[in-house]
Curated annotation (Swiss-Prot):
This is one of the proteins that bind and probably mediate the attachment of the 5S RNA into the large ribosomal subunit, where it forms part of the central protuberance. This is Large ribosomal subunit protein uL18. One of its GO terms (cellular component) is ribosome. Part of the 50S ribosomal subunit; part of the 5S rRNA/L5/L18/L25 subcomplex. Contacts the 5S and 23S rRNAs. Keywords: Ribonucleoprotein, Ribosomal protein, RNA-binding, rRNA-binding. InterPro entries: Ribosomal_uL18_bac-type (IPR004389), Ribosomal_uL18_bac/euk (IPR005484).
Amino acid sequence: MAKLSRNQARKAKNLKIRTKITGTAERPRLSVFRSHMNFSAQLIDDSKSITIVGITTAKKGSKEYHGNIKSAHELGLKFAKMIKEKNVSKIVFDRSGYLYHGRVKAFAEALRSEGIEF
């Protein structure tokens, strides 16, 4: 049997995680995605199948190095303010199969420092 690539293994982990967690209107799911150059996140209400709010480093005007830990932390602070504007304080964190380390951890800690509970 062939060895799974990193991305295939991550997708398998993500599928396993997604069967256990769902987002509701009271407690939406925060899904993160990281690529080599960018980082993005979106708040999802799975009961209505809608994205409440999303953010990414791939927009015009972003800093030159948007794939690093510092940018993920800054993005987390901005995203926390956007979440609070939507009157959401509790979320379900979906790390999408990525390890809770580096950019994912920096993003999550920035959200927690702004008072978002998960």
